Amino acid sequence: MRSIISLLLISAMVFSMIAAVPEEEGLQLSEDERGGCLPHNRFCNALSGPRCFSGLRCKELSIWDSRCLG
């Protein structure tokens, strides 16, 4: 009986912590978990390697220079 009550309390605590995370922050975490997204004006590779954050694109400025830009 105690184990059932403990399990319910732990489940309620986990659910309340998940609900407390703002939606945008949750999206940012999932982008980071996908494989290291890059912020604005960082070097990137359009074909492989780390991707830019959502809303940014890897733009080729020259043959050797590509950056995450909006």
Swiss-Prot record:
SS bonds (residue pairs): 44-58, 52-68
One GO cellular component term: extracellular region
UniProt modified residues of type Leucine amide: 69
One Pfam family in the UniProt entry: Toxin_7
Tissue expression from the record: Expressed by the venom gland.
Protein localization: Secreted
Propeptide: 21-34
Keywords per UniProt: Amidation, Disulfide bond, Neurotoxin, Secreted, Signal, Toxin
Modification after translation (UniProt): Does not contain a cysteine at position 53 which disrupts the cysteine framework.
Signal peptide residues on this chain, from the entry's feature table: 1-20
GO molecular function: toxin activity
Described purpose of this protein according to its UniProt entry: Insect active toxin causing rapid but reversible paralysis in crickets. No activity shown in mammals. Does not show effect on mammalian voltage-gated calcium channels.
Family from the record: Belongs to the neurotoxin 01 (U2-agtx) family.
Name of this protein: U2-agatoxin-Ao1q
Species per Swiss-Prot/TrEMBL record: Agelena orientalis (Funnel-web spider)
